[in-house]
Each structure stands twice: as C-alpha cells, then as structure tokens.
Amino acid sequence: MRSQPHVLGIVLAGGEGKRLYPLTADRAKPAVPFGGAYRLIDFVLSNLVNAGYLRLCVLTQYKSHSLDRHISQTWRLSGFAGEYITPVPAQQRLGPRWYTGSADAILQSLNLVYDEDPEYIVVFGADHVYRMDPEQMVQHHIESGAGVTVAGIRVPRSEAFAFGCIDSDESGRIVQFLEKPAHPPGTPDDPNMTFASMGNYVFTTKVLVDAIRADSENSDSDHDMGGDIIPALVEAGEASVYDFKDNIVPGATDRDRGYWRDVGTLDAFYDAHMDLVSVHPIFNLYNRRWPIRGETENLAPAKFVQGGLAQESVVGAGCILSAATVRNSVLSSNVMVDSGATVEGSVLMPGVRIGKGAVVRRAILDKNVVVGDGEIIGVDLERDKQRFAVSNGGVVAIGKGVWI
C-alpha cells in the first residue's frame, strides 16, 4: 500500500437515514448491512485503505453503538507509524450540544486536524456503494491548485434534479453548485449529462479550516458541507470538479466501472442489492485487486440440503437452505430457509429464519426476523401495508427482530 502521511481522512458517518426506516430504527445509516457480508461504511473505508490512506477519523453521532463497534472490531490497524481508523463521537468541545450539521461536526473535531497537521484532507460520506481510488482525486486536486475539489458523477440531465448539481467550465472550475435544481446544467462536453455531487471532497487544509470557522459564525447557515461550505468556496472561486469517469480502479470490469449508488431510500437500497446477483453483475463484489473489506466471522460454510437451491443469488456463510428455493436474492450470514419455502428477489440480513412453506418476494428483512410456517410476504401488498413498511416501489421492509 502507498503511504500518504500528509493526507488525513475524515468520514462523515453521523447520518440518521430516516428514508431507510425501519432499517435505521436501531442503527446509524452507515451501519446498515449491505451485500451479504458488509455494512455501508465498509465501501468508503475500503476505498481509502486500498489507496493507502491509513489515518482516518470517522465522525459518528446518531445511534452509533453498532457502528462504533464495527469500526473498532473490523477496522483495526496495527498502529505502526501512526496508522489508525478511529470512530469519533460528538465531543461537545464547544458546549453541551450535538452536531448541528456535517460542517459543525468537523468544526467540533478540528483538534484532530491540528494534531495530525495534514497538508490535505479528504472528506468523504459513509453511505454510498461504489469503488474509487481516492489518491487519483487527491493528485487531481493538487495539480488543479484549487482549494477544494468535488467528485462529480455524470448522470442524465433528466434525472439530475434529485442531486446536488455542479455547473463547471471547461477548465473544471465550478461556477455554480445547485441543490436539486429544476433545470440542471449540462457538462461542458455533453449538454445531456450533468455532474452530480458524490459527497466526496478533497481540501487543502487551510482552506477547509478557514471555511469551517467562517461558517460557524454565520447564524443563517445550516452548517452543512454540501449546502453551505461548498457553495461559499464556489463563490470564492476556490472549487473544482473531479470527473469520476477518469477514476481507474484496478480490476474493474467494463460493466461495473464508474458504478456509484446513493442508497438513501428503501427502493434505492433494494435496487443496489439486485445489481449484485446476476451472472455478470453491474457491481462486482469479487474484485480481488480492490477488495471490499467487511466483518469476518468464524462461521461454517453455507449448506444446501434435501434439494435446497439458490439461483442468481449471493449466499453468506452459515446459511442453510433445506428443500427450499432462493432466486435473485442476497442472503447474509446465518440465514435459514426451511423446506418448501420460496425466497425471490429479496434481501435477508443476518440471522433471518424463513419457515416451512413460506413465501417471501421483493422484501428486505432486517436482522433476526422470523417468518413463520406458511406466511406470505410481498404478494398481497395491501395486506402487507397494514403490518409493515412498503416502499413507493412496492418493496416490503421489516425491521429487526420481528416475528411473523
């Protein structure tokens, strides 16, 4: 791995994730399990560690116990040469209050910046699914001479109204930063595409510190990185865009190169899982040259008995399928599917139990959900709406530990 001692990583992991309820009823959004073996935060941490950035502070707040534990247990570094990945809860250094926004989270944690004294700071979000080599973005930032560089992903202009949008000139300088505009701007080379902000930033340290301090004195500010800090630096002529399509990740296939998903809603979370299950997946979990690291448990291998069958599915360790059928689904560890049961197009998190003859379709079942014998989920949505959360796209979501 490449060592970058002059770079400090700050991961913003305090998100509440209300639109992912009930998956966020008992945990922070970055701690939500994903992909059968990971949590959402594992993607950004894997990208940073794979790039050689080994001084990382993860700023946490909302229901952070499971997230703090996951970071402490899964992401231990040796401590050699000052390497660390450490969760940092709200420290209330500026009075008895929690973070009021992502910029305020950094303000309250500036002691970490002063202690490390980095030349550059990468500030990344913790709840997106993607692969990226951050070092390439840092090098682009250094060469551009900008105070801040914002990662932008090209999305069709007709869909860009749902994102923070970047209007840039041909040199890459950002001239406007627009939050969910009705009429998104095109890119300099393609009027039909728009740069959407990925929520990933590289700052020259002094620029970030000065901007954070100035924002803290603005009583009209929401103290948000994307809503306040970046627009202020755009207005000051300090901001440039980094085109995500230029980021080349080792081992990436033509099919999954440039993949990035905001999984902030139940439908988006579900769709991102369905991206994993095909023979040639849109997002490939099996890239050994740029691995996604997750929690490792001492579990037995998955087991299929009495004709148990899984097709186009991801099946985690410790799962047992007994005379059951699973199709187009993602099963996390220790899931048991009993005889005659059918699971189709679903996401089952660790410890889920599916009883004999049960049917589960287009559903997300959180940890330790138990579906009784003969139960049917995802077939009659009107009935399901009386019992569970059902997304706009018709995905049934059942919270942790529910017995049905």
From Swiss-Prot:
Q: Which family does it belong to?
A: Belongs to the bacterial/plant glucose-1-phosphate adenylyltransferase family.
Pathway noted in the entry: Glycan biosynthesis; glycogen biosynthesis
- Molecular function per GO: ATP binding; glucose-1-phosphate adenylyltransferase activity
Q: What does this protein do?
A: Involved in the biosynthesis of ADP-glucose, a building block required for the elongation reactions to produce glycogen. Catalyzes the reaction between ATP and alpha-D-glucose 1-phosphate (G1P) to produce pyrophosphate and ADP-Glc.
Enzyme Commission no: 2.7.7.27
Provide the transmembrane region boundaries. Answer: none
Against NCBIfam families, the record matches this protein to: glgC (TIGR02091), PRK00725.1 (NF001947), PRK00844.1 (NF002023)
The protein's name: Glucose-1-phosphate adenylyltransferase
